[in-house]
């Protein structure tokens, strides 16, 4: 089963008051918008596939899910049987349903106001915020965004996870491959 959701990271032109200590709002850029990180996480291994997009819409979500399913198969996670998502418009429309049909997966919708159902991915977003978005001082959001793929690689291959016995997620996939033989 795969979990899918999006995280909005604000765009910025320079470090903010948390870094500079300056609370003067006169030079602050407003209305720059957000960069959307659409993330897909394998339920068992906790492997994550993520892409940056300008908006969270049905097209971007469907493209990301298709690429994520192919990438997960390459890593050894197997075929997608189900996809867990919230009830945002981009997950309830025809385009997303068509993508699920192409993957041969059923759709599991989270009841309204129950984000704990998607707790594994929500925990990943907490880690993403702490270790990627705010983990260091970025000169601007474009530089931060370029570092996402490196962070995801680190998260999947080297970062210890308590749910995996202190090992990175990729080891759970590799362990499962050894047991299947």
Protein language model annotation of sequence segments:
Residues 27-28, 33-34, 51-76:
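Active-site beta-loop-alpha junctions of metal-dependent nucleic acid enzymes
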Residues 101-105, 127-181:
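C-terminal domain-tail junction helix/linker
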Residues 79-87, 101-120, 136-139:
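RNase H-like polynucleotidyl transferase catalytic core
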Residues 1-39, 47, 63, 181:
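Mobile-element integrase/transposase regions
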Residues 1-14, 89, 97-98, 114-115, ...:
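Basic, flexible linker segments flanking DNA-binding modules
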Residues 56, 74-93, 111-113, 165-170:
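Acidic/histidine-rich, metal-coordinating catalytic segments
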Residues 47-51, 108-110, 134:
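Short small-residue beta-strand/loop micro-motif enriched in glycine and branched aliphatics
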Residues 5, 40, 46, 65, ...:
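Mobile genetic element proteins and their domesticated derivatives, centered on retroelements
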